[in-house]
Amino acid sequence: MAVLAPLLAFLYAVPGLLRWVSQPYYLLSALLSVSFLLVRKVPPVCSVLPTQREDGNPCDFDWREVEILMFLSAIVMMKNRRSITVEQHIGNIFMFSKVANTILFFRLDLRMGLLYITLCIVFLMTCKPPLYLGPEHIKYFSDKTLEEELQSDGRVSWIIEFFANWSSECQSFAPIYAELSLKYNCAGLKFGKVDIGRYPEVSSRYSISPSPLSKQLPTLILFQGGREIFRRPQVDKKGRAVSWSFTQENVIREFNLNELYQKAKKIRKHQEDTINENEYNDSKKDQ
């Protein structure tokens, strides 16, 4: 049973994993991450490489390369303890693998190191992580439509995500936010997004720094009656975001989504009762 449960979970996730790894971004990133392994292990390429092994075998790792790879594994394990989504886990593996590959290639040959760095730069400039395109119940706003919607109906609570497409944290949070919108969206509680990369004036209006150093993206703000009630992450006196994990559990707890949802359903019921009463009165007048 202990083996069966993980196996079933893996089989259930296979279709999603196949769609995920079929993206060119992840395929090319994986290829760059294992490039030194391929060069060192695959003949006839490896046969012409220099080596520090005592047996002179150029197609196997020497002791220094093993140390670097072990150090990489330790760093990835430490970083992944704070990761939330699969994308973040894989992103950490790719990033630190490329750093290790750079060190290994430069140690092997200066020209190979320069070639590898050039390939990584070209990859970063031409390939971007795929955006989340799954189901969601989210309304996207511009700088003008956001204020209009917030002021249109004071009974509706809005949770707005301020994001930028270039932010890896925003990309990782996208499926979590979409799932929350599908679960909690109703007449009195709605979810929205604003791209402050496209509308920088919005970031100034709500005091959200778009700088990667500020760590303020994504920012979630709860609006009620057109006024800001609560936001995460909070910002310290130096303008840096206070560390906060954008997990589904944290968002539900900090924003009291269960309580907000119950109150919002009462608004929906009141609206339906009012509509039914008006229809009944109209029908009596017609008689």
From Swiss-Prot:
Function: Endoplasmic reticulum and mitochondria-associated protein that probably functions as a regulator of cellular redox state and thereby regulates protein post-translational modification, protein folding and mitochondrial activity.
UniProt keywords, alphabetically: Disulfide bond, Endoplasmic reticulum, Membrane, Mitochondrion, Signal, Transmembrane, Transmembrane helix
Cytoplasmic side: 134-287
Subcellular location: Endoplasmic reticulum membrane; Mitochondrion membrane
One GO location term (cellular component): mitochondria-associated endoplasmic reticulum membrane contact site
Domain Thioredoxin intervals: 135-269
Motif window: Di-lysine motif: 284-287
Signal peptide: 1-35
The protein's name in its UniProt record: Thioredoxin-related transmembrane protein 2
